[in-house]
Design a protein with these regions (language model features):
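Short, small-residue-biased leader/transition segments that mark boundaries at the very start
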Residues: 1-3
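Glycine-rich and polybasic anion-binding loops at the starts of cofactor/ligand-binding domains
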Residues: 105
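Active-site phosphate/pyrophosphate- and oxyanion-stabilizing loops and adjacent acidic/basic residues
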Residues: 113
Length: 221
């Protein structure tokens, strides 16, 4: 590996390694969780974990053709996601739930430091999770934890191929890398880690919340 390599790691294995896995049998739902669960036909224990992982509830919604509704949340880490990214897939046990790592940026940094200590190689690390998109179908992998990889690349002031000066262009580099990894990291692929090589980028001290839009710039909340 060289400094232009990016190591993309599925959030699930990081969460498992850090103990972010919970038995539903140990969860006692609050009154608020019970109330929401009735509206959404959702297990109140799951709702309780979602509430614990959330800073704000943005919307609860159940489509008439869906068996179970969804809670759109602002996670404690700042991400807007369905059900606070609480997940039941690939937990390894029945009636268990996995949540996001407590500090994905720190997790990414520790992994990068470990690789450097073992291999004397400085590599970028992106911890990924699968998010839905409000105006498009399907899900894509996004960056929820970063180490050395730039969150965005500011191209404002550069020129396009026609010589026109760019005014707002700022690709979300870390998210694009994460999305590419999703072509290999799948629910049933047994491939939780991907190395992406050959991209032209320089190491930065970006954080995952550099990808979050400020509330005063948010046109929809």
């Amino acid at each position: 590996m060289c400094i232009r390599d990016s190591l993309c790691i599925a959030q699930k294995i990081v969460s498992k390694a850090e103990g972010c896995i919970y038995s539903l049998n140990d969860i006692k739902p609050s009154k608020k969780a019970l109330k929401i669960s009735d509206k959404l036909n959702k297990d109140p224990r799951k709702v309780e974990i979602i509430l614990r992982e959330s800073k704000n509830i943005i919307r609860i919604f159940k489509h008439k053709n869906q068996n179970e509704g969804v809670i759109i949340c602002e996670h404690k880490l700042g991400f807007i996601s369905a059900n606070a990214a609480v997940d039941e897939s690939n937990t390894g046990e029945i009636d268990t739930i996995i949540t996001l790592p407590k500090n994905p940026d720190l997790s990414a940094s520790k992994i990068g430091d470990y690789i450097y200590q073992k291999l004397n190689v400085s590599v970028g690390v992106v911890i990924t999770d699968t998010f839905g998109r409000p105006w498009r179908l399907g899900q894509v992998n996004v960056a929820i934890g970063l180490s050395k990889v730039p969150a965005t690349i500011d191209e404002k002031g550069k020129s396009d191929i026609s010589g026109r000066r760019l005014k707002v262009t700022e690709p979300a580099f870390a998210d694009e890398v994460a999305a590419a990894s999703g072509l290999v990291i799948k629910k049933n692929s047994n491939t939780p880690v991907v190395i992406i090589s050959g991209l032209n980028w320089k190491q930065e001290n970006s954080k995952s919340n550099d990808l979050l839009r400020k509330i005063e710039e948010d046109m929809f909340r």
